[in-house]
Design a protein with these regions (language model features):
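One-carbon transfer enzymes
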Residues: 1-233, 278-280, 287, 306-315
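An anion-binding loop in the catalytic cleft
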Residues: 215-315
Length: 315
């Protein structure tokens, strides 16, 4: 089975690696163009490109694949039996979807039809899901609405973060792909249609603004936000006109009728902050311009008494 693999970030590396190790012919890899990073704006290859080059697989990096006749002609020359997509970063046009014998399949990081969209991993943590997983689906013109071919369920730990779940999902996706491909090739897979409506809201792309903590919300909701947005873009608030990133937090046992955002006190555990229905303890933080550290260490160099309020804007 001749494959073309389309993917970009770290999430898409384990499935590519698994394809190579399982002996599948990966005729080409398609990934996003190199992007400038760091202070020197040095062009950096995508993780998938780096992996492909290690295996001497030809790499293509079109700016856009829609209305790109040159790219389409290249695919026609390759004549893949199947195109495998994992977090590629562009919408796949109809003429590409219909090109391979077995069509295009997508490795999606949720138990479809739940969490269609660009950020299903973080959203599952933010929403407090007890489990999530990976779905391999046949791609159509809709966004994550194609027939489901296989699934794997992943339980979420109580301390699950977006980052920890990301790693689990990537590995599970690789394993599920290798299990599913033979049934696609042999024609024994049983596609399952998705309902038109998803039981969960669309998991839109994560933005930095989503990390702003609103302490008028329940403490449990904020604790999940902190975990879901760790490591990127991180939850944050403002104190004395400076940004304070919050990397870890736990629910306090005490109750509070203070105004949301008020610092109730500090101790070895961290900074106790009043929320809508209780207290959230910030246990690992990072002040603007400083290193990430445990709140106990932070408090040795930053005097914070009970009374001040965290705000949702720079004062």
């Amino acid at each position: 089975m001749k494959t073309v693999y389309m993917g970009t970030p770290d999430f898409a590396v384990p499935p590519l690696k698994a394809l190579v190790e399982a002996g599948y012919e990966v005729a080409a890899v398609v990934t996003q163009p190199d992007k400038p990073k760091g202070r020197g704006k040095t062009l950096m290859a995508t993780p998938v490109k780096e992996e492909a080059l290690m295996h001497e697989i030809p790499v293509y990096q079109p700016q856009k694949i829609r209305n790109n006749q040159e790219f389409l002609d290249t695919l026609k020359e390759i004549q893949p039996d199947i195109i495998i997509v994992a977090a590629f970063g562009q919408i796949i046009p109809k003429e590409v979807l219909e090109l391979p014998k077995y069509g295009c399949i997508n490795i999606h990081a949720s138990l479809l039809p739940k969490y269609r969209g660009a950020a299903p991993i973080q959203q599952a943590v933010i929403d407090g899901e007890k489990e999530s997983g990976v779905t391999i689906m046949q791609m159509g013109e809709g966004l994550d609405t194609g027939d489901m071919l296989s699934k794997i369920v992943i339980p979420l730990d109580k301390e699950e973060t977006g980052g920890s779940l990301f790693g689990k999902m990537a590995q599970a996706g690789a394993e599920l792909l290798i299990k599913t491909l033979p049934s696609i090739e042999q024609g024994t897979v049983t596609p399952e249609k998705q309902p038109q409506e998803s039981p969960t809201p669309y998991a839109a792309m994560i933005t930095k603004q989503m990390g702003l903590m609103d302490f008028s919300k329940p403490a449990a909701e904020l604790e999940r936000l902190v975990r879901g947005l760790n490591p990127w873009p991180s939850a944050y608030t403002f104190v004395n006109g400076k940004t304070l990133k919050v990397w870890k937090s736990v629910l306090g046992q005490e109750t509070s009728d203070a105004e949301p955002g008020t610092v109730m006190g500090t101790d070895a555990q961290g900074i106790h902050v009043a929320c809508k229905d209780g207290v959230l303890i910030l246990t690992e933080v990072q002040l603007e311009g400083k290193k990430r550290m445990e709140a106990e260490v932070f408090l040795r160099g930053y005097h914070m008494e009970a009374g001040p309020r965290f705000t949702d804007h720079k004062e």
